[in-house]
């Protein structure tokens, strides 16, 4: 049993590994997103003066982590292929625990930005968990397993800001960072002692120059489609963020409730994703991951149109929740399609590229959303994002159709 599982690429301990990765990703995402509600206050405490400077430094400090993570994600994926993916999780959790604890001890804004960069370089627990689960779970269960993991990641990013609003008044901002470091250290211990990984497959000795991970992919079209779709998903999701609060101001009569309604709007999509991700992942295992990708993109494109014309904040909340339900299966399906179309030995390398593409979308989305909203109006952001999602659905349908036709022709010739 163990031998067969190793040869087929999955691990007989995959359920336990999934549970540890779920708990570890949930806890590390909580710790990583705790700072969102109080980051501007911390920046002000560190010496930033004036509203513009506080906002600017807060944006730089927050974005620094994503920028650094986008640069190194393929590297960590490649090293995971060579030396083991568990080792990458141990490295990430230990490095994040140290850097997060040190963040509570900084004395200047520059030190804060530097540590946020280091967290991005050293971190990547949730992305590493995605790679480990994708590569060591039976392929026929990968959609469900990745859906469960995605729910944990999304739940952590949803709970984190809520706790971040509660803890600083009770224990202080600096102590909150130290507590975050302690939580991540617990994830480090669980990862070290509980995760069991198949050893990396031995490499055949050859005098020929080894091919890069990308060169070893027999059919690159599905992988390119999923890299593009992952970037599009992150871009579309984040493009709305800069305008939500201002948009809600136009919808809510009682201006004292603007921040509350805006917070619910931002959380509604995440809640929908949590509820649907494992179910859609399981559905994709039955009906095909491509079908769920195309359907999710098409439904989200349709749901974005009425968001541009709502007249009440609760209408926007309902539509964002439905959109979260539709998008819940996208990330698990993207990872599963890539997993099904690459050799086992390059999984970390290619999935690292996928994670980098998503980080690019996370950085570019808010920039584009803010620019379009400022120059063409907020409705244009929703409508423009709808067009992008529709184009993504059409693109994936074309790639899927051509690939299916090509496979039929190959089967007929053989």
Which sequence ranges carry the predicted segments?
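Paired small-residue
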Residues: 99, 110-118, 303, 314-322
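Helix-loop junctions on the cytosolic side of multi-pass membrane transporters
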Residues: 188-205, 398-409
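Short amphipathic helix-loop junctions that connect adjacent transmembrane helices
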Residues: 38-55, 243-260
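Cytoplasmic helix-loop-helix junction between adjacent transmembrane helices
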Residues: 115-153, 336-337
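Central cavity-lining transmembrane alpha-helices of secondary-active solute carriers
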Residues: 60-76, 267-279
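Juxtamembrane intracellular "pre-TM" segments in multi-pass secondary transporters
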Residues: 2-14, 197-227, 413-414
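Conserved MFS/SLC helix-loop-helix module at the cytosolic interface between two early adjacent transmembrane helices
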Residues: 70-107, 284-290
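Symmetry-related core transmembrane helices of the 12-TM Major Facilitator Superfamily/SLC fold
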Residues: 175-192, 382-397
């Amino acid at each position: 049993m163990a031998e067969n599982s190793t040869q087929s690429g999955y691990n007989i301990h995959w359920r336990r590994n999934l549970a540890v990765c779920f708990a570890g990703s949930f806890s590390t995402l909580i710790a990583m997103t705790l700072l969102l509600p109080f980051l501007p206050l911390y920046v002000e405490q560190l010496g930033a003066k004036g509203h513009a400077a506080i906002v600017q430094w807060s944006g730089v400090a927050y974005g620094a982590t994503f920028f650094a993570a986008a640069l190194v994600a393929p590297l960590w994926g490649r090293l995971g292929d060579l030396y083991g993916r568990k080792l990458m999780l141990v490295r990430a959790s230990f490095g994040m625990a140290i850097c997060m604890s040190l963040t509570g001890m900084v004395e200047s804004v520059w030190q804060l930005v530097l540590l946020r960069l280091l967290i991005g370089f050293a971190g990547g627990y949730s992305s590493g968990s995605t790679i480990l689960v994708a590569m060591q779970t039976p392929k026929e269960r990968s959609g469900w397993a990745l859906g469960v993991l995605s729910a944990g990641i999304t739940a952590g990013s949803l709970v984190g800001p809520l706790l971040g609003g509660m803890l600083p008044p009770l224990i202080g901002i600096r102590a909150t960072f130290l507590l975050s470091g302690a939580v991540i250290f617990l994830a480090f211990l669980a990862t070290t002692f509980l995760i069991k990984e198949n050893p990396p497959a031995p490499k055949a000795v050859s005098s020929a120059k080894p091919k890069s991970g990308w060169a070893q992919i027999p059919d690159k079209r599905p992988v390119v489609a999923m890299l593009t779709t992952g970037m599009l998903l992150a871009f579309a999701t984040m493009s709305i963020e800069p305008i939500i609060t201002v948009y809600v101001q136009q919808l809510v009569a009682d201006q004292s409730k603007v921040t509350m309604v805006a917070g619910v709007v931002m959380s509604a999509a995440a809640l929908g994703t949590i509820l649907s991700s494992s179910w859609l992942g399981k559905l994709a295992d039955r009906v095909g991951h491509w079908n769920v990708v195309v359907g999710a993109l098409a439904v989200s494109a349709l749901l974005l149109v009425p968001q541009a014309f709502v007249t009440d904040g609760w209408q926007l909340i309902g539509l964002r929740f439905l959109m979260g339900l539709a998008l819940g299966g996208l990330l698990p399906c993207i990872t599963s399609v890539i997993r099904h179309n690459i050799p086992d030995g390059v999984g970390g390398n290619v999935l690292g590229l996928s994670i980098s593409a998503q980080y690019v979308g996370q950085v570019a989305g808010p920039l584009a959303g803010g620019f379009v909203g400022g120059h063409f109006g907020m409705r244009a952001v929703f409508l423009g994002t709808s067009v992008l999602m529709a184009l993504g659905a059409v693109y994936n349908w074309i790639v899927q159709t051509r690939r299916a036709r090509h496979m039929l022709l190959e089967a007929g010739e053989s």
